[in-house]
Every structure is written in C-alpha cells, then in structure tokens.
Amino acid sequence: MAEDIEIDLDDLERRMKGAMDSLRAEFASLRTGRASASMVEPVQVEAYGQMTPINQVGTVNVPEPRMVTINVWDKGMVGKVEKAIRESGLGINPQTNGTIIMLPIPELNEERRRELTKVAAQYAEHARVAIRNVRRDGMDQIKKGKANGMPEDDQKFWETAVQELTDKSIGNVDQALEAKQAEIMQV
C-alpha cells in the first residue's frame, strides 16, 4: 500500500502559479502613472444590451508613456465607452476626438505613490497566503501518506520538495512586489 502513495507536486505547483497569475493581474490593475492597455481591461461597457469588456468595442493602444487611446469601432458606442471609463473609478478623465477616446494619465504625487505601494504589498501578502495554503494542503497529503504507511524517507523527501516549491513561489512573489514598488515609486 505504501508504494501507491504519491504526492501530486504538479498540482501544487499549478495552484501556486495560479496565485502568482492572480497577483500579476492585480498588479496590472494598479495605476502607476504609466500608461498600459491593461489599465482599462476591467472596464465593462454596456454594448448591445449586455456588459462587454472595453477591448471588444474598440482597439486599445498606448501611443505615449502617459496616454492610452481607444479607437471605438461603432461611432454610436463612443458615449457609452466614455461613460464607462468615467464611472470605472480609474480617476481618468477621457477626451473624445471623433471615434478616438484619449485617456491622459496624470502623474502621481508622492502620497499616492506610497498608498499604491501599500496596496501592492497587500496584494502580495494575499498571494503569499494562497501559496501557504497550497503548501498546507501538500503537507496534509504527506500526513495522510504517513498514516497509510509511507516510509519516513519518502515523507522527508516530499516535505522537502513541497517546501522548496513554496520557497520558490514566495520568492517569485517577493521579486514581483519589489519590481512593482520600484515602478510605482519611479517619477
């Protein structure tokens, strides 16, 4: 029976990567004073009777470091896109020129930058907690294996493998946080 006990490291790694992917998405939603197409991804527009992502009603471009443009395909949708951006909470005032909506990204003041670094740190902590929860699940699998007759050497091997995977994943979170904080604080 002990031979059949196998810990699914691939599943644990996939779940830890999922936490990292979620962190990257949360980081992308933070406005850093630099224009990026991902800033407007969460914005939903009421189009043709249903809520639609903004990138499905127009082309999103970043022509300059502090400017996002949206070239709306349907002229009748321009007002709705503009309204959706204003109501999205991005804090950006859209400017319209025909079917092109320009979003000038204002520079962030020092206080706002510090607030954003704290928000980024909170997002990173949520990712660390998610990774630790996956680690706990892995350790629980090992305990079940031990109860079912897993040899002590195998138990130590799996515990080390799970811990190394956890350390690597948390290291990736820390690196991503440092990079995001540096990006936010850059003037």
UniProtKB/Swiss-Prot annotation:
GO terms for cellular component: cytosol. CDD domains: RRF (cd00520). Keywords: Cytoplasm, Protein biosynthesis. The keyword Methyltransferase does not apply. InterPro entries: Ribosome_recyc_fac (IPR002661), Ribosome_recyc_fac_dom (IPR023584), RRF_sf (IPR036191). The keyword Cytoplasm applies. Its main location: cytoplasm. One of its GO terms (biological process) is cytoplasmic translational termination. Responsible for the release of ribosomes from messenger RNA at the termination of protein biosynthesis. May increase the efficiency of translation by recycling ribosomes from one round of translation to another. Belongs to the RRF family. This is Ribosome-recycling factor. It comes from Paracoccus zeaxanthinifaciens.
